[in-house]
C-alpha cells in the first residue's frame, strides 16, 4: 500500500503560516430586546453578551509590529475588537484603516507575543489554475482549521448578497471555507500568503461551502497596509 510521505504539502504550508494567523472577534452592538421579552438561551457555538453579539473571523499578521489584515465585514459595526494570537495571547485591537472597495480592514494589536512572526507574502501574479493552495481560519469559530485545494480561476468578480459591495480581480479556490474563515490567509504550498479569504458563493439560503471560494489577491491587500508593490 503506497502512501504519501508525511508531512504532507498542506501540513508544511500550515506549519509555516500558523504562527501568523489570529482569531478576530468583534463585539457588535445590537438593539436591546423589549423589557417584557423572555430571555433566550444562547445556541451552541454562540455567545450571549449584554446588548451585543460576537462576530468571529480570522486575520493574518503581515507586519511584525502587530499590523493585521482581515475583512471589513468581520469587524464592521463592532464597538470593540480583540484578537487571539497563535500563542493564546489575547489583545484588544485598534482599527487602523478600512478599505470597503476590497472588503479589507487593517488592525493593530495593543499587546504582542514576544516571538510574533509576520507571514511571508508572495505576489499572486504567477498564480494559475490548478496551483495548490491552503486556507486557514476559524470556520464557525472552530480553529485554527486547515483545508487544502487548488486555484480554480483568476480575475473573478463577486457581489456580496449581504453588503452589496462589488469585488473584482478575485482568486477563486476550492479549499473548504465557511463563515469564520473570512480574513484568513490563502497560502501556497510553501506557506506564502497570496490572498485574503473573503467570500464563498452559495446560491441557496445556507451559508455553507459548495466548492467556490474567493480571495482578495495579496498584491491588492498589501497596498492597504502600505507595503510596497511586489
What are these regions (language model features)?
Residues 1-48, 52-54, 58, 67, ...:
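N-terminal activation segment of mature serine protease catalytic domains
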Residues 19-24, 59, 66, 70, ...:
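Terminal peptide-recognition signature
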Residues 43, 48, 63, 85, ...:
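Acidic surface patches and DE-rich sequence motifs
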Residues 56, 63-144, 221-222, 229-230:
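Conserved active-site neighborhood of the chymotrypsin/trypsin-like protease fold
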